[in-house]
């Protein structure tokens, strides 16, 4: 199948036309309107500094139902100890920049380019991109970030600078998302790490159908706070 070159308008081809590896289109920009259009259609950007902007819609898709979250026994002990304080939206830019700096086995460089950082910081300021942080005292020990639309949360990346810090942030984030009415956490592509937490692969068509239902719900815009469902008023 051909790889589509995107027009200036924030429009995308049908995800069913993606290559077997999930690559759907090339080009365009990372302006908020295009990014939010992409997420609403089950498409996300993933590229490195040496390539043009690439857009993906893999089949199958890794997802997590918040109600199906599995917490390994060893991590349950860490959670009970309260080793980390977990927050939301207290350090979004620090989290995404730390994710960009993280060493990734088998990868040279990072896909979270400066252009990507700027784009997601803009989404954060619009109230649709969010971070969860794990703190050890006053030190940022780990965290993750993603995009929220309707009752769906699209996880993007996570990092840890201390043992289990990102895992604690992940578990607390999924628990909070469930309490806030989120029905679907998009994990994009399979990793054994996320499978251990209950994520599973589903066909792209099923993912898109579930996403469409999730988008019928209102988006939790604004700064999020843990300890309650939804952002502060």
Swiss-Prot record:
GO terms for biological process: protein catabolic process. GO terms for molecular function: leucyl-tRNA--protein transferase activity. It is an enzyme of class 2 (transferase). It holds the Pfam family Leu_Phe_trans. It catalyses: N-terminal L-lysyl-[protein] + L-leucyl-tRNA(Leu) = N-terminal L-leucyl-L-lysyl-[protein] + tRNA(Leu) + H(+); N-terminal L-arginyl-[protein] + L-leucyl-tRNA(Leu) = N-terminal L-leucyl-L-arginyl-[protein] + tRNA(Leu) + H(+); L-phenylalanyl-tRNA(Phe) + an N-terminal L-alpha-aminoacyl-[protein] = an N-terminal L-phenylalanyl-L-alpha-aminoacyl-[protein] + tRNA(Phe). Gene3D superfamilies: Leucyl/phenylalanyl-tRNA-protein transferase, C-terminal domain, Leucyl/phenylalanyl-tRNA-protein transferase, N-terminal domain. The keyword Acyltransferase applies. Its EC number is 2.3.2.6. The keyword Acyltransferase applies. It comes from the Bacteria. InterPro entries: Acyl_CoA_acyltransferase, Leu/Phe-tRNA_Trfase, Leu/Phe-tRNA_Trfase_C, Leu/Phe-tRNA_Trfase_N. GO terms for cellular component: cytoplasm. Keywords: Acyltransferase, Cytoplasm, Transferase. It is found in: Cytoplasm. Functions in the N-end rule pathway of protein degradation where it conjugates Leu, Phe and, less efficiently, Met from aminoacyl-tRNAs to the N-termini of proteins containing an N-terminal arginine or lysine. Belongs to the L/F-transferase family. This is Leucyl/phenylalanyl-tRNA--protein transferase. It comes from Anaeromyxobacter sp. (strain K). The lineage of its organism: Bacteria, Pseudomonadati, Myxococcota, Myxococcia, Myxococcales. The gene is aat.
């Amino acid at each position: 199948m051909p790889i589509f070159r995107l027009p200036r308008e924030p429009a995308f081809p049908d995800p069913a036309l993606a290559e077997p590896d999930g690559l759907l289109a090339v080009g365009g920009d990372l302006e908020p309107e295009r990014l939010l259009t992409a997420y609403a259609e089950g498409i996300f950007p993933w590229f490195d500094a040496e390539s043009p902007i690439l857009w993906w819609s893999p089949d199958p898709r890794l997802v997590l139902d918040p109600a199906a979250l599995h917490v390994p026994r060893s991590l349950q002990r860490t959670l009970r100890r309260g080793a980390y304080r977990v927050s939301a939206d207290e350090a979004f830019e620090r989290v995404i920049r730390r994710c960009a700096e993280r060493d990734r086995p088998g990868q040279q460089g990072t896909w979270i380019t400066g252009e990507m950082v700027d784009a997601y910081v803009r989404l954060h300021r619009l109230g649709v991109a969010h971070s969860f942080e794990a703190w050890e005292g006053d030190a940022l020990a780990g965290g993750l970030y993603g995009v929220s639309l309707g009752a769906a949360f699209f996880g993007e990346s996570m990092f840890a600078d201390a043992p289990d810090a990102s895992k604690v942030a992940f578990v607390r984030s999924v628990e909070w998302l469930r309490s806030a009415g989120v029905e679907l956490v998009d994990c994009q592509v399979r990793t054994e790490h996320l499978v251990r937490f209950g994520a599973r692969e589903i066909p792209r068509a099923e993912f898109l159908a579930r996403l469409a239902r999730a988008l019928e719900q209102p988006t939790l815009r604004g700064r999020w706070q843990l300890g309650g469902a939804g952002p502060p008023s």
